[in-house]
């Protein structure tokens, strides 16, 4: 909420879309205003084969947030197609084969690129065992390039 306060202190309206403010359907894993949509429309990156948001600099190792505001801001050109090449690391790493070979574009539904139910069920089972699954995120070659820089 510090970003919201900062913008308000500059004299603009602002509303941070926090987890509690951006209503989310946990069954479908969808929010009213999806951060990934905002980010692709702002030119920050694209949706990878894994349905995760991907940037050239960080790969899929990204956490998104959003602030609605009337403050003028600069943004890039909308990205409407995946910039992933023929790499299938995320797809190959998926333990439940939830990732489809279809590359993302902004005309597809999420279900066209990933079986979100299968993915969600696996993640829930892993969390019950005290684990998690970030295989698609960690195997993204752009994520690997970023991690090697550090």
What residue ranges belong to the model's regions?
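Catalytic cores of enzyme domains
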Residues: 1-150
């Amino acid at each position: 909420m510090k970003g919201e306060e900062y913008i308000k202190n500059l004299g603009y309206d602002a509303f941070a879309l926090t987890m509690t403010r951006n209503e989310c359907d946990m069954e479908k894993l969808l929010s009213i205003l999806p951060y990934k949509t905002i980010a692709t429309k702002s030119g920050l990156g694209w949706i990878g084969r894994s349905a995760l948001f991907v940037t050239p600099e960080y790969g899929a190792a990204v956490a998104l947030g959003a602030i609605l505001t009337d403050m003028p801001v600069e943004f890039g050109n909308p990205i409407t197609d995946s910039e992933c090449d023929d790499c299938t690391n995320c797809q190959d790493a998926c333990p439940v084969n939830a990732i489809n070979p279809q590359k993302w574009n902004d005309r597809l539904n999420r279900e066209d690129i990933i079986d979100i139910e299968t993915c969600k069920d696996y993640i829930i089972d892993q969390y019950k065992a005290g684990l998690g699954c970030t295989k698609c995120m960690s195997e993204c070659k752009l994520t690997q390039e970023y991690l090697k820089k550090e």
